[in-house]
Amino acid sequence: KKILILGIMLCYVNISDARPISWSGGSTLMYKTNFMTTSYYYHYSPTYKYSLGIEYVDDKYFKEDYLNLRATYLINRKNTKKSQRNLYVTGGISSESINNFNYGIHGDWETRRIFASFAYINKHKKIKNYTENEFQLGIAPYVGEYNDLHAWIMLKTKKDTINNNWEIYPFIKLFKGDVLIEIGTKNSHWDVHYMFRF
């Protein structure tokens, strides 16, 4: 029911994407859930170069919940007539302890038809340190105009050093105006990402 409501919302909002930094002075709300964690994240971008935010995390794997203070910085952006490339560094510190923190790098490249991205995140926790690797590749079945509903058919592959194996699964990305939703499933677990910019 929640997914249906989010999908309907997409049709009524005035293209944006899942980049971790908004326009200068912009804010973003994000919701993510998968088999390991659920998180609610708000960030503000004083400029297009960086964002600062706070995140509530429900860690299902380690059975704990906490807040993260997070920051993301745009290292490099390259625009051409047909594509855009972005590279970011990110980091955060937990409300539990200064010894609970994370840092990483992620980037993306896209045309109006093709999307590719990667992420590497190192997470330090009192219980166990681990890393997460992720790659995404997608294609748009059609090229929409500015105010259209845009769709991407995607493949995601992920590996963390807890489970220590690569998992590949499909998902769909939809966005219109300032709203984005990604929905996928693996091993009967939903992988959902919802984003709203304002």
Across the structure, where does each feature detected by a protein language model lie?
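Short, glycine/acidic-rich beta->alpha junctions
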Residues: 164
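Transmembrane beta-barrel domains of bacterial outer-membrane proteins
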Residues: 19-158, 167, 171-198
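Cleavable N-terminal export/targeting peptides
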Residues: 1-21
